[in-house]
Amino acid sequence: MAAPFSGSGTKQDPWLLKTPSGTSDISMYKDPSANPPALVCFTSGTELRYHLRAIEDLHQMLKAHGDWMELGNADEQKPAKDGTVEAWGRSPDNPVGGWYGLKKGLRGRFGNYVPPVLEALGLVELEHNPRNNRVRAI
């Protein structure tokens, strides 16, 4: 079941979401005028930025994967578990050739903050357990 959310994804009306575990609030919006275009995330007073194309790219990757995939959340300074959304979000083999995160030192946690946006857009099914959540394309 999709987590409740509100907002339209603009700076004036951001998506108000929760992390997959439901333990943290996140506010996200699209900033297409940024260079490069960004998906902006605010959580616990911290701003993170990801390539805006992450929404479409992640959805396409999950569709091609065809099954559930672990999120595998990890900070930038920690290695990501192979075969997870987090590992894909920093892989040299993804469409951007590396990190989707744009702010050095805050490029991790892709698997924690980007999938809830895809869920809000109706693109994925996302688990909401205390730990070890997974995602799959719809």
Predicted regions and their residues:
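Short, hydrophobic-biased segments on the C-terminal half of alpha helices
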Residues: 59, 112-116
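A short, conserved structural fragment
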Residues: 119-133
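Short amphipathic alpha-helical surface micro-motifs
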Residues: 7-9, 19-22, 105-107, 115-119
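Generic alpha-helical scaffold signal
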Residues: 49-52, 108, 112
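C-terminal engagement modules used by replication, chromatin/transcription, nuclear envelope/ESCRT
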Residues: 134-138
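Long, low-complexity, charged/polar intrinsically disordered regions in eukaryotic proteins
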Residues: 2-80
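Generic low-complexity segments that are intrinsically disordered, proline-rich and/or Lys/Arg-biased
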Residues: 15, 93-96, 117
